[in-house]
A protein has these predicted regions:
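Active-site loop-to-helix junction immediately N-terminal to the catalytic Tyr of the SDR YXXXK motif
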Residues: 46, 92-100, 112
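Alpha-helical segment proximal to the catalytic Tyr-Lys
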Residues: 71, 115-119, 176
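The beta1-alpha1 cofactor-binding region of Rossmann-like NAD(H)/NADP(H)-dependent oxidoreductases
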Residues: 5-16, 48, 161-162
């Protein structure tokens, strides 16, 4: 096991992390881009800093790590890159213009990158979770969570393990012909 603390929004730091992983293990088979924050407010109240913070962590970090990892994976002629998007990146949500833009940007990045690296046997996919029980959702008031659940046909929020199982599938050879796709894990929200 190797633990490395790093700023995912820092281009050079991402390359250093990938280099350290390759030095330690000899190669890089799987990259999961899962950094994410929110700074929710209506667009007319949103500061430039709130916009930049979310785009840097949620989208720029994916670019940084994909840039670093794809170079190594091209040499290996194999690899799986999985980026965490969101139902909000697919459908939008009031008060989350920055978050929606960052998560929609991930979808575009995944679709384009999959076409760039597919000939080298590198798969690039995204997962778009719906409302998942996390620290982010647990901090919401009970009334907000109750309203969220009403919008989910399965009448419950998802569990982090349910998203992790999809990531495991996408990282494995069971998905050897799956690339450029966005897999929704959202209880039939859309």
């Amino acid at each position: 096991m190797l633990c490395i603390k790093s700023n995912a929004a820092d281009f050079q730091a991402a390359h250093q992390v990938v280099n350290q992983v390759v030095e330690a293990f000899g190669k890089l088979d799987i990259l999961v881009c899962n950094a994410g924050i929110t700074r929710d407010t209506l667009l007319m109240r949103m500061s430039e800093q709130q916009w930049d913070d979310v785009l840097n962590v949620n989208l720029k970090s994916v670019f940084n790590y994909c840039h670093a990892a794809s170079t190594q994976m091209m040499r290996q002629r194999s690899g799986s890159i999985i980026a965490m998007s969101s139902i909000v990146g697919v459908a939008g949500n009031a008060g989350q213009v920055n978050y929606a833009a960052s998560k929609a940007g991930i979808i575009g990045l995944v679709k384009a990158l999959s076409k760039e690296v597919g000939s080298r046997n590198i798969r690039v996919t995204a997962i778009a979770p719906g409302y998942i029980l996390t620290d982010m959702t647990s901090s919401l008031p009970d009334t907000v969570r109750e309203e969220m659940v009403k919008t989910i046909p399965m009448h419950r929020c998802g569990e982090a393990e349910e998203v992790a199982k999809v990531a495991l599938f996408l990282a494995s050879d069971l998905s050897s012909y799956v690339s450029g796709q966005v897999i929704s894990v959202n209880g039939a929200m859309g």
